[in-house]
Every structure is written in structure tokens, then in C-alpha cells.
Swiss-Prot record:
Gene Ontology cellular component annotations, sorted alphabetically: periplasmic space
GO biological process, alphabetically ordered: cell division; protein import
Entry protein name: Tol-Pal system protein TolB
Protein species of origin: Rhodopseudomonas palustris (strain BisB18)
InterPro entries (alphabetical): 6-blade_b-propeller_TolB-like, PD40, TAT_signal, Tol-Pal_TolB, TolB_N
Subunit comment: The Tol-Pal system is composed of five core proteins: the inner membrane proteins TolA, TolQ and TolR, the periplasmic protein TolB and the outer membrane protein Pal. They form a network linking the inner and outer membranes and the peptidoglycan layer.
Gene name per UniProt: tolB
Functional description taken from the UniProt entry: Part of the Tol-Pal system, which plays a role in outer membrane invagination during cell division and is important for maintaining outer membrane integrity.
Disulfide pairings: none
Subcellular location: Periplasm
Main location per the UniProt record: periplasm
């Protein structure tokens, strides 16, 4: 295990937090026995009241980072829609020592069901030590606890990792906070719009620009390792698909095909890129092996086949095709052949993407003058629209498959913004970005 978090961008899932005992459990005697858990369904869920005091400062110099970590955790859990952080002004007990049990009655009085306590301490070697404990207030018992070591500049990532620990322990599902989003940053007027490839934390922090905006870029997608991004760029001549290495900043073209290449996406094992290639007036799906550079044709129709997305186990592909007259969603084996249409509602369907859990396919649906974001099961059943408006497009799943991010363009002289919504259709939230933003793609978990 690494001795510290790597420099930004964090792209290696195995490069976690450093030092001996970097993820050691912190359990007081009798801990981890309580059973508090939020029951998640696809209907309405009453958010769990949770108290998150500022993390205790190991030294006076650690006070600011202790406040910051608590605030990031609070914002993460609140934005999920599953938790209701209690205003700190209501707190009765002041946490000064996380090594002793809290006064549970004080937290029961303000109706907290769960309590998070923590401490941030700068070590003699310059590293930052982060500790936290999660408590079941009703049972008066500790649920879990961990400690981590890292460089001080990575305190926000510590907060995201702790948020994931809390989310998983209280919901039974994996979290999604220690992840990133690649998107298209847009600036300037609509007539002279500049589009740059950009990277940020899932909450909008730590924005980093990967391209300068000299050429138009679209549809970025993460590799499973999060080390690379594939995207389409309009440079000199036809649009091409590229690979961009986040760690080195190097890029390379994916194949040198005649005509346009677009809508790229990695296979689940990261060894192949599937894309659409234009030949004549048609566009068909091809897959390229990144090691051998060999290319295999997957579809061969007088139509436009595009926007492919693999099932998480790599066995199937969903894609968009107008072979039936207007854009619809089809599913076929990953090796090609036997495509089956799964969308049959009114309107047209585009930009399908498979959930990391394999249970849903998200899509953009156009009809009745609106663009909607929806989900359906892989066999086409259970279609449900989550949000509608003038122009909603480009859904991407969070690593746990629970939340979708998409972009919305209100029209007029403005520009697009990023939003998230739960797969139940609840809890729509705007994602902060420096300017206009479109084409989001969520990374897998970084840890």
C-alpha cells in the first residue's frame, strides 16, 4: 500500500491511503454490534437524522481541517437525499474526546439516530492522521471506526472516503462519494463556444482542465481503472476518438479509420474501446483491442448505430439505432449479432448507458417537445421517467448505480448545467461547476 495519496488526479484504485495501519479499525469495547440501518426502496424514503460535529483538532493548527472534513461529510450525506444532518446549533454535547463514548441521551434529545465523531491530527512526519467513529444513538453502541494517514492536501478525499464508510454502514449499499466526474466545460457565447475536457470531484470540487479548448471535444468516458479517458475530438479533418492518460497528460488516437469515429466507451475490463464508425451514410459499431490494435465489426446495417454501452459483466451491449425508422435502444451480445429492440414507448430514445449494478439501462427520451431522463430494465420492462424538461440529456450512473448525473440546457442565451437525480426520481440536485457544463461521465470508485 502506498505511503501517501498520489498527486492529483487520483486515478489508481489501489493507491489508497498510506502507512502501516492506514485503514485500521477503531472500535471501542462492545462496538460494532448495533443494527441501525436505513431501509432503501424505490419509493419515498424518510431521511435519517444524523449528527456530524466538527472533527476534534489534535492540535490547534488542525482546527480548520477538522471543520472542513465535517462540512464535506455533511454535504455529501445531505446531497444523497438519504440523510438529514442536524444543525450544529442544536447540539447539546460538545465532543472533545472521540476515545470515550458520547453522552447518548444528549443526542437522543435532538432526535439523532446516528452520530459521527472524528479527529484530525498533523503528525510529526508531516502526514495527516484522520480518525472517525460512527455511533448508533438508540443502542448506545459504536457501529464502525477507521483511521487513515495521508498528506494534508488530500483532506477532502479523506472526507469522501469516510462519507462512503458511513453511507455503506447505514444503508447496506456501497457509497459513491470517493469518485470523480469528467465533463465538458463550456465558456463563451453560443456562437463562439469553447469546450474543454475537465475533471472534478463528484461534488464539484478540485476542477482540473485537461485540454485547452483549441479543438471541440465531446463524450468523455472513464476507463475502469480511472487512469484514462476516451473521448471524441474535432481537430483537423474528421472527428477522431482519443485516449487521454490522466496521470501523464499524454494522448493518443484510437485507430486511424477513414471517416468519422465517435461515441467511444471502454469495455468493463479496460482492454477494448467500442465506438461508432461512419462509412458512407451509415454508422456501425466496432470494437478495438487496445493491445493488439485489431478491430472487429459488431453491426452491419444501413442505419446509424451509435452510443454503445457494455453490461457490467461484459456479456452484452446496449446501443442506439435508427434501423427501425427512429432512434431506439437495442441490446445484443458483446460479440455482435442478434440485436433485440427494448424501447417501445412513444418518442425516440438515445444515449443508453448500463448501470454498474446491471439492473437498469438509463437513457434520454425525446417526445412531446421535451427531453427526459429515464431508466428501464435490460429487457425493456419497467420504463420510468425521472426528470423532464426543455433539454435533458446524457445520463451517467454513480459507481453504486443509485444516482444519475445528466446535463440540462434551458435554451436561450444560457448554457447547460449538471444535475443529479436518484433512480427513484427524487432528490434532483444541481452540481456546482465553474461555468456551463455538459456530457458528464462518472468514474468508478477511486478506493
Amino acid at each position: 500500500m502506498s505511503s501517501r495519496l498520489p498527486a492529483l488526479p487520483l486515478s489508481r484504485r489501489q493507491a489508497l491511503l498510506g502507512g502501516a495501519g492506514s485503514a485500521a479499525a477503531l472500535l471501542l469495547p462492545g462496538g460494532a454490534q448495533a443494527q441501525t440501518r436505513l431501509q432503501i426502496t424505490e419509493g419515498n424514503v424518510a431521511p435519517m437524522p444524523i449528527a456530524i460535529p466538527n472533527f476534534v483538532a489534535g492540535t490547534p493548527a488542525d482546527n480548520e481541517v477538522g471543520l472542513g472534513v465535517a462540512q464535506v461529510i455533511t454535504n455529501n450525506l445531505k446531497r444523497s437525499g438519504l440523510f438529514a444532518p442536524i444543525d450544529q446549533a442544536a447540539f447539546i454535547e460538545r465532543i472533545s474526546n472521540i476515545d470515550t463514548p458520547p453522552q447518548f441521551q444528549s443526542w437522543k434529545t435532538i432526535n439523532a439516530q446516528a452520530l459521527v465523531t472524528g479527529r484530525m491530527t498533523k503528525q510529526g512526519d508531516g502526514r495527516l492522521k484522520a480518525e472517525f467513529r460512527l455511533w448508533d444513538v438508540a443502542a448506545g453502541q459504536q457501529l464502525t471506526g477507521q483511521q487513515y494517514f495521508t498528506s494534508p492536501e488530500y483532506w477532502r478525499r479523506i472526507a469522501h472516503i469516510i462519507s462512503d464508510q458511513i453511507y455503506e454502514r447505514l444503508t447496506g449499499e456501497k457509497g459513491y462519494f470517493d469518485s470523480r466526474v469528467v465533463f465538458i466545460d463550456e465558456t463563451g457565447s453560443k456562437e463562439r463556444r469553447v469546450k474543454r475536457l475537465a475533471l472534478m470531484d463528484q461534488d464539484g470540487a478540485n476542477v482540473r482542465y485537461l485540454t485547452r479548448g483549441a479543438d471541440l471535444v465531446l463524450t468523455p468516458r472513464f476507463s475502469p481503472s480511472t487512469q484514462e479517458i476516451t473521448y471524441m475530438e474535432f481537430g483537423q479533418g474528421d472527428p477522431r476518438v482519443y485516449l487521454f492518460n490522466i496521470e501523464t497528460g499524454q494522448r493518443e488516437i484510437v485507430g486511424n479509420f477513414p471517416g468519422m469515429s465517435f461515441s467511444p466507451r471502454f469495455s468493463p475490463d479496460g482492454q477494448r474501446v467500442i465506438m461508432s464508425l461512419q462509412q458512407g451514410g451509415n454508422s456501425n459499431l466496432f470494437v478495438m483491442d487496445l493491445r493488439s490494435k485489431s478491430t472487429t465489426r459488431l453491426t452491419d446495417t444501413p442505419a446509424i448505430d451509435t452510443s454503445p454501452s457494455y453490461a457490467p459483466d461484459g456479456s452484452k451491449i446496449c446501443f442506439e439505432s435508427d434501423r427501425g425508422g427512429k432512434p431506439q435502444i437495442y441490446v445484443m451480445p458483446a460479440g455482435g449479432g442478434g440485436a433485440q429492440r427494448i424501447s417501445f414507448g412513444e418518442g425516440s430514445y438515445s444515449t443508453p448507458v448500463w448501470s454498474p449494478r446491471g439492473d437498469y439501462i438509463a437513457f434520454t427520451k425525446q417526445g412531446g417537445g421535451q427531453f427526459s431522463i429515464g431508466i428501464m430494465k435490460p429487457d425493456g420492462s419497467g420504463e420510468r421517467l425521472l426528470t423532464s424538461g426543455y433539454h435533458n440529456e446524457g445520463p451517467t450512473f454513480a459507481p453504486n448505480g443509485r444516482v444519475l448525473m445528466f446535463f440540462r440546457d434551458p435554451g436561450g442565451n444560457g448554457g447547460p448545467s449538471l444535475f443529479t437525480v436518484d433512480i427513484s426520481g427524487r432528490n434532483e440536485q444541481k452540481v456546482p461547476t465553474p461555468g456551463f457544463a455538459s456530457d458528464p461521465a462518472w468514474s468508478p470508485l477511486l478506493s
